[in-house]
C-alpha cells in the first residue's frame, strides 16, 4: 500500500498535538510512579526490591514488546491501535485501585499499563513519520516532550490526589484522565492511499480452467443446453431407495467422463496447494535465516556490541532515580515541608530540556554524536555516585536536575545508532537495542531495591548504579577511539600476487 506524499504540515500539526497529549496522558503516571511507590510500600508492607518491580515493569514491558507493537501498528493502523491502547492504559490504572496485594499490581499496572504505553508510543511515532518528511525531526522532538511534561505534571498531580482522595481514588481519577486518549486517537486520520483505480473483478470467463474445480460442467454451457435438443429429459421419478428425486437421462459416456475428470482435477488442485504451502514455508524459513544472519553481522560490529552493553548498563543504573528519588529523600530524613517541588517533577522537566538541547547539539557538524553520548553516560555515572553524599533537599534537587537533563540523551540515541550501523540497518538495530533497554529498565529498580533491603541504605545501591553506567560509558569509549583503526592499519597485509593488471585509459 502506497500513501500520499507527506504533507509536512496541514493536518499533520493536529497529529503532532494529539500525539503529544497521547504520550502525556499515557506516560505521565508510569514515569511519575515514584510518588505511588512510596504509598505502595506503606500499603502492602513489602520489600523495596519487590515493590520496585511494579514501576520497572510498566517502563520495561513496552520496550521488550516493541517488535509486537510494531506488528500491531503495521497490521491495523495507528488509529485503531491508539484507541485500543487507551482502553488498556485506563483499564489498567483503574484496576490497580482495586489491587489486594503487590502481585496484582504486577499484572494491572506493570503489564497492562506497560503494554498499552508501548503500543501508544509506536503508534504516535509511526503516524507522525507518515505525515512529516522534511520536518520530521521537529515533529518527533515535539511529541517526545509529551512524556517528560507528563512526568513533571503527574508527579505533583498524583501527590495532590493522594492527599485528597487517597491512593485508590488517585488511581481511579488518573485512569479516567487516560480515557482522553480515545479522543486523541479518533483524530489520527490516516493518510489516504495514492489515487489509483481499483482493480476490476475478474470475470468468470477470464479465470483459467485449472482454478475451477467443476470446469468440465461449466465451460461449455451450449453443450448442456443441447441435451434437451437431443431428446434427453429429466423427470421426477421414485428412486430405488424410495426417495423422490430428479433422474436425468444422460449418455453413458458423458456420465463416466464427468465422474473420472472431477477427481483428477481435484487431486491436481490439492497438489498445487501443497506445493504452494511448501514454497511459502521455504520462503519464511529463508527470511528467518536472513534475519539471523543480519543480526549476527550487527554483533560483529565492535561499536554496536559496545553500544548494546552501554544501553543495558545505562538503564540498569540510570533509570532507578526517576522511580526511587522520593523514597531516597525520605530515607535521608528530608522534611516534608522542605519538599517545595517533587524531585520527580524536577527530573521530568529537566529531561524535556535535555532532549531539546542535546538534540540541537547533535545537529552541529563539528560535534561527534558518539562522543557526546559517551559524555552523557560518564557524567551520569558520576552524578549517581554523588547521591549518597546529598543529604538535603537542595542537593538532591540539583542532582535530580542533572540526572534528568542527561537522561534526555534518548533524543540523540537514534543518531548514534544510525552512525554506528547506517540508515539501511537502523530499524533492525534499533529494535534490538530497545529490547536491551527494556531489559535494563525492568531489572534496574528491583536491583537497587534489593540492595536497600540488604544494607538498609541507598548508598551501596547508587554506588553500584554509578559503576554500571560508568562501565558502559568506558566500554563504548574504548570501542569508538580511533586508536583501534590505527592498530588495524598496522597489521601486516597479505602478500599481493605478482600479477600485473593493465587498465586502458579512457576519457569517459
UniProtKB/Swiss-Prot annotation:
Organism of origin: Mus musculus
Keywords: Cell membrane, Membrane, Transmembrane, Transmembrane helix
Pfam families: MFS_1
Residues exposed to the Cytoplasmic side: 1-12, 481-508
Any one cellular-component term (Gene Ontology): plasma membrane
Keyword match Transmembrane: yes
Full protein name: Monocarboxylate transporter 9
InterPro entries associated with the record: MCT9 (IPR030767), MFS (IPR011701), MFS_dom (IPR020846), MFS_trans_sf (IPR036259), Proton-linked_MCT (IPR050327)
Amino acid at each position: 500500500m502506497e500513501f500520499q506524499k507527506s504533507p509536512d504540515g496541514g493536518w499533520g500539526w493536529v497529529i503532532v498535538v494529539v500525539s503529544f497529549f497521547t504520550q502525556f496522558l499515557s506516560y505521565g503516571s508510569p514515569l511519575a510512579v515514584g510518588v505511588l511507590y512510596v504509598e505502595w510500600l506503606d500499603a502492602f508492607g513489602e520489600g523495596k526490591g519487590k515493590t520496585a518491580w511494579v514501576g520497572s515493569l510498566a517502563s520495561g514491558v513496552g520496550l521488550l514488546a516493541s517488535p509486537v507493537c510494531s506488528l500491531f501498528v503495521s497490521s491495523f493502523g495507528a488509529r485503531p491501535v491508539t484507541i485500543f491502547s487507551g482502553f488498556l492504559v485506563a483499564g489498567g490504572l483503574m484496576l490497580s485501585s482495586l489491587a489486594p496485594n503487590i502481585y496484582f499490581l504486577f499484572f494491572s499496572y506493570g503489564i497492562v499499563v506497560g503494554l498499552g504505553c508501548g503500543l501508544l508510543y509506536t503508534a504516535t511515532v509511526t503516524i507522525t513519520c507518515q505525515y512529516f518528511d522534511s520536518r520530521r525531526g521537529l515533529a518527533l522532538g515535539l511529541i517526545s516532550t509529551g512524556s517528560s511534561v507528563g512526568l513533571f505534571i503527574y508527579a505533583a498531580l498524583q501527590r495532590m490526589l493522594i492527599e485528597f482522595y487517597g491512593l485508590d481514588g488517585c488511581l481511579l481519577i488518573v485512569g479516567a484522565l487516560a480515557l482522553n486518549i480515545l479522543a486523541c486517537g479518533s483524530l489520527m486520520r490516516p493518510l489516504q492511499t495514492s489515487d489509483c483505480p481499483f482493480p476490476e473483478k475478474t470475470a468468470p470467463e477470464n479465470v483459467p480452467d485449472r482454478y475451477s474445480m467443476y470446469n468440465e460442467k461449466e465451460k461449455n454451457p451450449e453443450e448442456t443446453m443441447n441435451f434437451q435438443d437431443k431428446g434427453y429429459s429429466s423427470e421426477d421419478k421414485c428412486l430405488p431407495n424410495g426417495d423422490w428425486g430428479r433422474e436425468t437421462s444422460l449418455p453413458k459416456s458423458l456420465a463416466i467422463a464427468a465422474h473420472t475428470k472431477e477427481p483428477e482435477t481435484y487431486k491436481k488442485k490439492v497438489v498445487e496447494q501443497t506445493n504452494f504451502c511448501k514454497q511459502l514455508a521455504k520462503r519464511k524459513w529463508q527470511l528467518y535465516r536472513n534475519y539471523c544472519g543480519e543480526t549476527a553481522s550487527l554483533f560483529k560490529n565492535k561499536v554496536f556490541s559496545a553500544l548494546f552493553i552501554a544501553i543495558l548498563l545505562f538503564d540498569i543504573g540510570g533509570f532507578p532515580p526517576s522511580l526511587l528519588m522520593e523514597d531516597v529523600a525520605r530515607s535521608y530524613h528530608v522534611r516534608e515541608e522542605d519538599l517545595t517541588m517533587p524531585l520527580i517533577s524536577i527530573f521530568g522537566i529537566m529531561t524535556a530540556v535535555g532532549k531539546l538541547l542535546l538534540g540541537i547539539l547533535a545537529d552541529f557538524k563539528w560535534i561527534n554524536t558518539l562522543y557526546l553520548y559517551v559524555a552523557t553516560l560518564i557524567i551520569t555515572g558520576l552524578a549517581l555516585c554523588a547521591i549518597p553524599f546529598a543529604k538535603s533537599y537542595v542537593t538532591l534537587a540539583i542532582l535530580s536536575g542533572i540526572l534528568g537533563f542527561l537522561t534526555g540523551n534518548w533524543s540523540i540515541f537514534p543518531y548514534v545508532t544510525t552512525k554506528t550501523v547506517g540508515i539501511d540497518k537502523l530499524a533492525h538495530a534499533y529494535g534490538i537495542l530497545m529490547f536491551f533497554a527494556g531489559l535494563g529498565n525492568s531489572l534496574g529498580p528491583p536491583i537497587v531495591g534489593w540492595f536497600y533491603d540488604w544494607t538498609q541504605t541507598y548508598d551501596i545501591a547508587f554506588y553500584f548504579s554509578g559503576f554500571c553506567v560508568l562501565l558502559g560509558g568506558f566500554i563504548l569509549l574504548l570501542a569508538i577511539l580511533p586508536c583501534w583503526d590505527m592498530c588495524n592499519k598496522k597489521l601486516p597485509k597479505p602478500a599481493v600476487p605478482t600479477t600485473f593488471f593493465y587498465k586502458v585509459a579512457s576519457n569517459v
